[in-house]
Amino acid sequence: MVSGRVQGVFFRDTCRQNAVAQGVTGWVRNLPGGDVEAVFEGPEDRVTRMVDWAHQGPPAAAVTEVEVRDEEPERLSGFEVLPTPRA
């Protein structure tokens, strides 16, 4: 989960572009409360690069916190921008 000024700053699109460039699979979506949620899967070094990127985000973002959890892989293919879930 990424907190701060992370919506309305092209966070999701930039995240997708970076993930595709890194060869990382997963997804990213806005949450109703203003945060962004993402899942990254791939080689550990590439996932680490994505998490490092999430701490900065795109130029207009102001990231205040990144919460990271290790979970069982879902064996995703590609990287998607998902719709915001209903509150």
Regions found by a protein language model. Name each.
Residues 1-87:
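Intrinsically disordered, low-complexity, mixed-charge
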